[in-house]
């Protein structure tokens, strides 16, 4: 099973809110997921990013591939530095 860390869209029309989830790469964007590890709210000012570092590091070490947007969120949250160690 190829696992990805990606965003799951929630919220209302024209007011997106995203949950950072670990999901099978073949499942739909808003479909089944294995575990929720955080959230991202691009509408709030400043943008709200909350990611559970322990869960994120555990999943990446187990082979989960973060998408490009999630990599950027990891960098903004400071998790990227801990992954490179």
UniProtKB/Swiss-Prot annotation:
Disulfide bonds: none annotated. GO terms for cellular component: cytoplasm; small ribosomal subunit. It holds the Pfam family Ribosomal_S16. It comes from the Bacteria. GO terms for biological process: translation. InterPro entries: Ribosomal_bS16, Ribosomal_bS16_dom_sf. One of its GO terms (molecular function) is structural constituent of ribosome. Transmembrane segments: none annotated. The keyword Transmembrane does not apply. Keywords: Ribonucleoprotein, Ribosomal protein. Belongs to the bacterial ribosomal protein bS16 family. This is Small ribosomal subunit protein bS16. It comes from Clostridium novyi (strain NT). The gene is rpsP.
């Amino acid at each position: 099973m190829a696992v990805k860390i990606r965003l799951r869209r929630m919220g209302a029309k024209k007011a997106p809110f995203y949950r950072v989830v670990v999901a099978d790469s073949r499942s739909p964007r808003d479909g089944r997921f294995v575990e929720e590890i955080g959230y991202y709210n691009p509408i709030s000012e400043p943008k709200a990013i909350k990611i559970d570092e322990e869960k994120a590091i555990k999943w990446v070490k187990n082979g989960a591939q973060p998408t490009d947007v999630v990599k950027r969120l990891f960098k903004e949250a400071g998790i990227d530095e801990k992954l490179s160690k």
